[in-house]
A protein has these predicted regions:
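N-terminal export signals
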Residues: 5-26
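Catalytic-core regions of glycoside hydrolase
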Residues: 37-107, 149-153, 239-389
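Conserved, mostly hydrophobic/aromatic
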Residues: 119, 227, 240, 429
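The substrate-binding groove and active-site-proximal loops of carbohydrate-active enzymes
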Residues: 125-135, 204-218, 260-265
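Active-site-adjacent "subsite" loops/lids of carbohydrate-active enzymes
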Residues: 163-226
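Surface beta-strand/loop "capping" patches
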Residues: 402-430
Length: 430
């Protein structure tokens, strides 16, 4: 074969392979979120007449109106759906993270904490479904829901399938582990050894299951169905986190070079199918998907895109690391709520840690507001207690009060007009 013919044929094969891969992969390349076409947003049913309401001929549709009332903004903290500071009851390591000799009392103190308007729990699959067939909530979760109802607060929920900080037991139930193959995790390089140490020393986090295995998928669908039957549309539930794999959020598998899948396409197909299962079951309660970059190459970009296009919500587990996440959070469509999880230190406030007069906590709060978050975590990292949270409020009350008033949305009827039309009294709200 002549060299020129060889080069032509090689290029043709490469182009064909690239086109084939493009058709097979659903991966969404990195993009700016501002003006990105995510669709027109959710349809709003039963809306009142949105106007216009001209009052002078020839366009008049109402008689002359008069302003009968105006309102002014309030400095009060107004709890509402879709916004607020979220008190973390459990996070990475279950009730072991609650620093108290009396867990029930500590849970009650956290629920009653006036600083938080919402609550959050993060149990493992094993904790809520140790056996197939039905949910069996542990006592601490039952207590959280009972106290939430008494204190007029709602609960956000994530169920973990991988929890490297649970050292006493695996996150998955035995009935799944016994029937699903597992793949050992491998460090990417020696520089990651220190970061991966806590995972490798825990026998329950040294591996990942073959999520694509038929038995795993069958058990997962049953779990999601049971969760939806219990929580979708439940007035106590504010939101549900989607199941994910990777850098942040579910698993924290970022020190490792491998994942449990044979190839990217299998990983992407598995996780997007699992997201679709959740979207099919949860029609009333919002689902939150993490904006984490796809470090582990499992299809996170497609999951995030489908989440936004289905008018569900997003979340992040950091504020100061990847610029990709800040881009997504800051420029998301206006109908998409965002939760920002950024833990406060587990130790008391340190006056010496301030930089140019700004403490780390105040800096964090300012940047959570900068991205326009709807929710922010009240969480002392791996040192959960109402006392720890209050120590930060007492040290920086102005910052906490400011975010409590500003987070989410503040909507009020500013102008109110009144008119009479054929004997009927009408109001226009603006």
């Amino acid at each position: 074969m002549q060299r020129r013919d060889f080069l032509k044929s090689t290029v043709a094969v490469a182009v064909a392979a690239e086109l084939g891969m493009g058709k097979a992969e659903a991966k969404v390349p990195a993009h700016n979120w501002g003006n990105y076409n995510f669709g027109s947003g959710p349809q709003v049913a039963d809306r009142l007449n949105q106007g216009p309401f001209p009052q002078y001929p020839p366009d008049a549709v109402i008689p002359t109106d008069d302003v009968v009332m105006t309102t002014t903004s309030s400095e009060d903290i107004v709890p509402n759906y879709g916004k607020g500071l979220v008190t973390y009851i459990t996070a990475d390591s279950g009730t072991e993270e609650i620093k108290s000799d009396n867990i029930p009392q500590a849970v009650e103190d956290l629920v009653r904490l006036p600083l938080g308007q919402q609550l959050y729990v993060r149990p493992t699959w094993r904790e809520i479904q140790p056996r197939p067939g039905r949910l069996e909530l542990p006592d601490y979760l039952k207590l959280v829901f009972e106290l939430a109802k008494k204190n007029n607060k709602r609960v956000g929920l994530r169920v973990q399938m991988c929890a490297p900080d649970y050292k006493h037991e695996a996150a998955l139930p035995d009935f799944v582990l016994d029937k699903v193959p597992k793949v050992d995790l491998v460090l990417s390089d020696q520089e990651s050894a220190a970061s991966g140490k806590r995972f490798l020393e825990n026998p329950h986090s040294r591996y990942q299951p073959r999520y694509d295995h038929p038995f795993f998928q069958q058990a997962f669908k049953e779990l999601v169905g049971q969760l939806a039957a219990e929580f979708d549309g439940n007035p106590l539930i504010e939101f549900i986190d989607t199941f994910m794999y990777g850098f942040w959020g579910e698993g924290h598998t970022w020190p490792f070079a491998n994942n449990p899948f044979p190839d990217y396409l299998t990983a992407e197909r598995t996780w997007t199918n699992m997201l679709e299962v959740q979207l099919e079951h949860f029609k009333k309660t919002p689902l939150l998907t993490n904006t984490q970059p796809d470090y582990s190459r499992v299809g996170n970009s497609e999951m995030l895109d489908r989440t936004v296009r289905s008018n569900n919500w997003i979340r992040s587990d950091t504020i100061f690391i990847e610029n990709e996440q800040i881009e997504a959070l800051s420029n998301r469509p206006p109908w998409i709520a965002a939760l920002l999880e950024q833990g406060l230190p587990g130790k008391p406030p340190d006056p010496g840690a301030a930089h140019e007069g700004i403490s780390p906590a105040e800096n964090m709060i300012d940047h959570v507001m900068d991205i326009g978050a709807n929710y922010w975590s009240l969480w002392n990292f791996h040192q959960i207690s109402a006392k720890n949270l209050m120590s930060y409020y007492q040290a920086f009350p102005a910052a906490f009060d400011r975010i409590s008033r500003r987070i989410g949305y503040r909507v009020r009827p500013s102008f109110i007009w009144s008119y009479k039309d054929e004997g009927y009294l009408g109001l226009i709200i603006g």
